[in-house]
Swiss-Prot record:
Family of the protein in this entry: Belongs to the protein kinase superfamily. Ser/Thr protein kinase family.
Entry GO terms, CC: virion component
Predominant location category: virion
EC number assigned by the record: 2.7.11.1
Protein name, per record: Putative serine/threonine-protein kinase R400
Location of the region described as Disordered in the Swiss-Prot/TrEMBL record: 443-467
Organismal lineage: Viruses, Varidnaviria, Bamfordvirae, Nucleocytoviricota, Megaviricetes
Catalytic reactions of this protein: L-seryl-[protein] + ATP = O-phospho-L-seryl-[protein] + ADP + H(+); L-threonyl-[protein] + ATP = O-phospho-L-threonyl-[protein] + ADP + H(+)
Length: 467
């Protein structure tokens, strides 16, 4: 069972816009006092994550879909269970029983993405990812090390961090099943416009099917829907209005979550951590505002991060692995080894690939053309020195580092880089009844922290008296 330590994530509201460096820490300490006094705001504390979980629970009602996660069991063992049950279901009947209609979004080389919208409540939306099994590539369709199944296992394992309110920055799965591939070959006319060039991938999928490249069944994954698209698309559309604070918070959300995962699973590698494999959720104005802040805790370290109206969620784990826990036949293939996609522990790899692809001209050409604040350019150069940037002999054409070096880690970056300096605070805070830190904190704590008495700022030393 995992030792949770003090890794927690929650939020609060500030009443003024004074100097943020001082005010963030005061608000944090004040909020912790209110939590341990069991303030009346506790009833609202869980709303953002509780709402996510409640939405997912409701997806099972009235249908035949089996839940992937037991949201009421927070133990590590529950999420580590290797068993993934994929019943053979009729997709049309299932979605009818769930009361949703499917809207086609896009296709990839081996599958499709749909948006499932509730017929009774248009605000209830899910994502449906359909993956075909290429024949003879990675073994039988029930193999746990096939990339299609690895992705599902990884989503289940990593959902531990969301359910236990350690980070919100991961997509939660709902359920998975097998269905006949022909359900997605003979999609009704009008659902997909085959004359539209953006749907060429779907036509290639059909061609591959008729060439006999796919197995008879497809894997269907139902998960949370993120309303902001992928991060790369979001940046391309909004970079001209993204402030230094916005960039800093987005980067922090990613690096904090990687550091958190590495703490429990040091050998975790996403292996395809680029901006278009990260999704964006535009947050509800009721829970987000200019004076909203979030407290992130990692061990004995605390960060106070302002709300920016969006939250990223890491996604797309078909290249991922955790050596000794989640084996991936795609990662072990000869072609991936040649480009340094590996299961070997390296906490720098994913972070490097994210930034080195982001700054490339094929991804975001505006990066070096005034599209980001200079502070962000300087930050990326500190994380990705010239010898590990595009154009170096150490990098392949698609931005992957070819040498096995752990130049730095996400944890080291959030702890030492000046970009995050004003957001870093000591974890040691004062318990109102006992001279010790409380063992539990609450995700998304709501309230006006400044209304509580604010003790002197912590210097990191053990207090000599109760407050």
């Amino acid at each position: 069972m995992m030792n949770k330590k003090n890794n927690k994530y929650k939020s609060d509201s500030l009443d003024s816009k004074e100097d943020k460096v001082d005010l963030y820490q005061d608000a944090m300490i004040s909020n912790l006092i209110s939590v341990n006094n069991k303030s009346t705001s506790d009833s609202d504390a869980k709303k953002p994550t509780e709402n996510r979980i409640e939405l997912l629970k409701n997806a099972y009602k009235g249908g035949t879909l089996k839940p992937m996660i037991d949201f009421d069991d927070h133990n590590t063992e529950t999420f580590m269970d290797k068993r993934i049950t994929k019943n053979l279901l009729d997709a049309r009947s299932l979605f009818l029983s769930m009361g949703v209609k499917l809207i086609y979004i896009k296709s990839g080389t081996t599958g499709h993405t749909f948006k499932a919208i509730s017929r009774s409540n248009k605000n209830v939306v899910f994502a449906v990812k359909v993956c075909a099994y290429p024949k003879d590539d990675y073994g039988g369709i029930k193999s746990s090390s096939r990339p299609e199944n690895v992705e599902i296992r990884m989503l289940k394992i990593l959902s531990y961090f969301v359910v236990n309110r350690l980070t919100p920055h991961l997509v939660l799965p709902i359920g998975t099943f097998h269905t006949d591939i022909e359900k997605f070959i003979n999609i009704p006319e009008g659902v997909i416009d085959l004359k539209d060039e953006k749907n060429d991938m779907y036509k290639k999928f059909i061609e591959r099917y008729h060439d006999g490249e796919f197995e008879k069944f497809v894997s269907v994954l139902i998960s949370e829907w993120c309303n902001g698209g992928d991060l790369l698309d979001y940046i391309r559309k909004n970079y001209d209005s993204m402030t230094l604070e916005t960039w800093t918070v987005v980067i922090f959300q990613l690096l904090f979550t990687l550091a958190l995962i590495h703490e429990k699973f040091p050998a975790f590698r996403h292996n395809d951590m680029k901006a278009n494999n990260i999704l964006v959720e535009k947050t509800d104005n009721k829970h987000e505002g200019p004076d909203k802040w979030y407290r992130y805790s990692l061990g004995s370290h605390v960060f106070i991060i302002p709300g920016i109206g969006i939250q990223i969620k890491i996604w797309d784990f078909d290249f991922a692995s955790i050596d000794g826990i989640v084996e991936n036949k795609k990662v072990n293939a000869d072609w991936t080894k040649k480009i340094n996609i590996s299961k070997k522990k390296n906490m720098y790899y994913d972070m490097h690939y994210f930034f080195n692809t982001l700054i490339s001209k094929r991804f975001f050409p505006q990066f070096y053309e005034g599209g980001v604040p200079q502070e962000i350019v300087d930050f990326v150069h500190r994380i990705v020195p010239e010898e590990f940037r595009n154009g170096s002999d150490n990098i392949n054409k698609k931005g992957r580092i070819l040498v096995d070096v752990e130049y730095t880690t996400p944890f080291k970056v959030i702890m030492t880089d000046p970009l995050f300096e004003k957001y870093r605070y000591n974890q040691y805070y004062f318990h109102p009844q006992r001279n010790m830190a409380p063992k539990k904190s609450i995700l998304f704590q709501q309230g006006n922290g400044s209304k509580q008495p604010v003790p002197k700022k912590s210097t990191g030393q053990k207090p000599t008296k109760k407050v």
